[in-house]
A protein has these predicted regions:
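General helical structural elements
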Residues: 6-7, 41
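Positively charged n-region of N-terminal signal peptides that target proteins for export
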Residues: 1-4
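Scaffold/interface architecture of coatomer-like assemblies
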Residues: 22-410
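Bacterial N-terminal signal peptides
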Residues: 7-19
Length: 410
């Protein structure tokens, strides 16, 4: 049975967060240093020769003095400057989420790169497939070869994507069949044998068309239900990762989605044929002209929660070609989640990419997550609880700066 990807993520994060101590809670009146992760790039590479004097930090528009700078390269401390600097390298936690309905062979190269160039002994890694989460044992990177681990992950990922997305693919096939029936092309060779026994499937009669439209709506709603992005679970996921110390990298692989629907020519024909039937006209317009997925989560609330938790979130939107379906048109339908995930990446100092090459997109995300400056400062006196926006500006021109949007004062 296919599980909600967000449910699986929440389960994975709870298991990870529960095994790590959050530390002592200090009185709210005592200001504590805040860590800000900053990635600086120029000319396609990381800029590693910056000092405290090169950065300006503002909190809600007010300049704040920086206390320290720590340069992190591939999880190791390369340079320190200032007071109360970091002494030991931060632990690293990676969570990889896969919301895919079809296996893409290019993912194998991404998995090879992950184990060959990113993960190292001591890292925590959780893999979340459409079926369930998996945790990499803490000593696995020390006891097994990276090639063996990459092969095991590749096989698991392939198996779970095919198994966990079976219901989704069945619904796509059902919507394709119904689109052909509604269009009046269901009688073509090879497309009607599965519905021939039902007299109400005659798309040329008003009653049959209404039945087909109703079945299409039901299947569409079932598809919506199994891929629902739940705001509450996203917020809980961020909260569960907040106490986890060190670097917290979350990478979401999301595959482009398509919905089968009747083609424009068939739509025009049906609108003409049933112009005297307002109920059928309304249903046709509702499903095939006006239907649009609305955002299922408040991107502003979720992105602030992820930034506050210290997560660097990376969104990899995997492009794929539209399938050719006789008698139907494949309509792209990722509009409800794409903008929100892009906003989350931007607000956490992460990356977003639309690509047919997941390995290249992963490489770009890994470069941002593994090489960065950790700046610390004391926040201003709290007046009212809420989100404090932190902006980082670089005095050196020609550089791209990625940093989280801020944090909550409670």
């Amino acid at each position: 049975m296919r599980r909600s990807i967000v449910y699986a993520v929440l389960t994975a994060a709870a298991a990870l967060g529960g095994s790590l101590a959050a530390g002592q809670t200090l009185p709210a009146s005592v200001p504590q240093p805040v860590d800000i992760r900053v990635h600086v790039a120029a000319g396609g590479g990381f800029v590693d020769d910056l000092s405290l004097a090169d950065f300006d930090l503002t909190e809600d528009g007010r300049p704040q003095p920086l206390r320290s700078l720590t340069l992190i390269r591939s999880g190791q401390i390369n340079r320190r400057q200032g007071i109360d600097v970091m002494v030991t390298p931060p632990p690293r936690t990676y969570t990889l989420l896969f919301q895919l309905t079809d296996w893409d062979p290019n993912l194998s190269k991404a998995v090879e790169y992950l184990f060959g160039s990113v993960l190292r002994a001591g890292d925590h890694m959780t893999l979340v497939t459409p079926f369930k989460p998996y945790h990499l044992q803490s000593d696995a990177l020390s006891l097994r070869t990276k090639a063996d681990l990459a092969k095991a992950m590749d096989e698991t990922l392939r198996k779970d994507i095919l198994r966990g997305s079976g219901e989704y693919r069945d619904l796509v096939a059902e919507l394709s069949r119904l689109s052909r029936a509604i269009s009046g092309t269901a009688g073509a060779a090879g497309s009607r044998e599965d519905i021939e026994s039902d007299p109400t499937d005659d798309a040329d009669s008003g009653f049959g068309l209404e039945t087909q439209i109703d079945r299409y709506r039901q299947s569409l709603m079932r598809m919506e239900g199994i891929r629902l992005v739940d705001e509450a679970k996203l917020l809980s996921f961020a909260a569960s990762l907040k106490p986890v110390p060190g670097q917290k990298t979350v990478i979401l692989f999301y595959q482009r989605e398509f919905r089968p629907e009747i083609n424009p020519a068939a739509m025009n024909r049906l609108m003409s044929l049933y112009q005297d039937n307002p109920q059928i006209l309304a249903n046709l317009m509702d499903l095939f002209q006006l239907f649009k997925r609305e955002r299922k989560f408040d991107a502003d609330a979720v992105k602030k929660a992820f930034a506050d938790a210290g997560i660097d979130f990376h969104f990899i939107f995997m492009e794929k070609k539209s399938q050719r379906v006789f008698g139907a048109t494949m309509h792209e339908q990722s509009e409800d989640v794409y903008p929100g995930f892009v906003e989350m990446a931007r607000a956490t100092g992460g990356t977003s990419a639309s690509s047919t090459n997941p390995a290249a997109a992963l490489k770009a995300a890994a470069a941002v997550s593994t090489d960065y400056y950790l700046l610390t400062y004391l926040p201003g006196a709290a007046s009212v609880p809420g989100f404090r926006r932190v902006d980082i500006r670089l005095k050196r021109p020609g550089c791209q700066v990625l940093s989280p949007a801020g944090f909550f004062v409670r």
